[in-house]
Amino acid sequence: MTDTRIERDSMGELAVPATALYGAQTQRAVNNFPVSGQRMPQAFVRALLLAKAAAARANVSLQQLDAPMGEAIADTCLQLLQEDFMQHFPVDVFQTGSGTSSNMNANEVVATLASRRLGGKVNPNDHVNCGQSSNDIIPSTIHISAALEISERLLPALRHLEQTIQSKAGEVHAYVKTGRTHLMDAMPVRMSQVLGGWAQQVRQAGVHIESVLPALQQLAQGGTAVGTGINAHPRFAERFSQELNDLTGLAFRPGDDFFALIGSQDTAVAASGQLKTLAVTLMKLANDLRWMNSGPLAGLGEIELEALQPGSSIMPGKVNPVIPEATAMVAAQVIGNDAAIAVAGQSGNFELNVMLPLVADNLLHSIQLLANVSRLLADKAIASFKVNQGKLSEALARNPILVTALNPIIGYQKAAEIAKQAYREGRPIIDVALENTDLDRARLEVLLDPEKLTAGGL
């Protein structure tokens, strides 16, 4: 038995692995693009198969395919989704800019299996690709995959992170710590106020990400090659969206303008921008956690993160803040992905963007990373850290910035003199204020009470 078989396409004959479900066009792409060894994302291929199933059903309803053939195509797509389908999709991310290679990969695999199911010939171009062009199915698949991943993975992960932060805020409400601006001592804050700020950042990032879903749910499908809809039934776009909604439970619809959706990737650029904002938020949270956990002896030591693994191959007993570090690296990667997507978004020449696979890969990579690390940050860092009350109290007692509360009574200049003396002499602020003002200790204890100062006001 030979290891290959001969397949044919419009360019001629080509040897293909004997057991491969794909055909000549996929094999040409494999031969042409041995670039990264990185295949198109699983979420993208999943969405592409859903789109092919929706297209087949739409074409049956519009009498563009006979029912047995259309059903064979749709059923094949859905069956593939229940299996290890990625083994049949070997095309590299760095391929033709339209993603035609990935489209034909899907068409050929589905045609092979649908032919077996039907007991007759199913053609990759004429049947599986009926009413479609790579130029509308690939932009549509980018939107479909991103919308699904955001809805099913990222937004639930962000809700979990926010809820975990809120729960921890309630747990640590009684603790008051030294606030810091410019990494320098400032007025006191409650730990719950710090975490409340984090929760709001995460919540707002989620709102902004969710706000791009209506745009992602507008599809280029039906515009075919250049946006005019050539070779697609006039009602194909509408029927396609209806069938896709039945399969996904989302609210996809034909785009307001096919020319814009095929010629540009503005929606993906906008979505990536919101993902970058979330990355910036998570970087801030990670850095706050690392600083508060620093030490344990020579740093701030305000909290103790859960010890998850040894931190050094040479220094025994060292434990590092590995989850915040992983979070910070994810944030850096997402910011880099956003830059790549922005460059790719500029690469729309006339009627087609020609960096579609790059957009898909980076956008879905960012969503995946952010969803996964948000859950890790919640479960393995925020939920389990412990507060070091001794460190908090020690720092508060020696914080001359508490004198700020005396500004309305003794004035800024006098307060500054007291703060500087307390710094210089290493004495508690209340003792220095007692010597340099007419206020008695009882009054100063009320005015300089860190807990009361966290409530603001005069």
Curated annotation (Swiss-Prot):
Family matches, as InterPro entries: Fum_hydII (IPR005677), Fumarase/histidase_N (IPR024083), Fumarase_C_C (IPR018951), Fumarate_lyase_CS (IPR020557), Fumarate_lyase_fam (IPR000362), Fumarate_lyase_N (IPR022761), L-Aspartase-like (IPR008948)
CDD domains: Fumarase_classII (cd01362)
GO CC terms of this entry: cytoplasm
Recorded superkingdom: Bacteria
Ligand binding (substrate): 98-100, 123-126, 133-135, 181, 313, 318-320
Reaction(s) catalysed (UniProt annotation): (S)-malate = fumarate + H2O
EC number(s) given by UniProt: 4.2.1.2
Molecular function terms, GO-annotated: fumarate hydratase activity
Cellular compartments annotated: Cytoplasm
A GO BP annotation: cellular response to iron ion starvation
Sites annotated Important for catalytic activity: 325
Entry annotation: catalytic residues: 182, 312
Pfam entry (one): FumaraseC_C
Keywords assigned by UniProt, alphabetized: Cytoplasm, Lyase, Tricarboxylic acid cycle
Description of what induces expression: Part of the fumC-PA4469-sodA operon which is repressed by iron (at protein level).
Functional pathway: Carbohydrate metabolism; tricarboxylic acid cycle; (S)-malate from fumarate: step 1/1
HAMAP family: FumaraseC (MF_00743)
UniProt family annotation: Belongs to the class-II fumarase/aspartase family. Fumarase subfamily.
Function text: Involved in the TCA cycle. Catalyzes the stereospecific interconversion of fumarate to L-malate.
Other observations noted: There are 2 substrate-binding sites: the catalytic A site, and the non-catalytic B site that may play a role in the transfer of substrate or product between the active site and the solvent. Alternatively, the B site may bind allosteric effectors.
Subunit text: Homotetramer.
Protein's name in the database: Fumarate hydratase class II 2
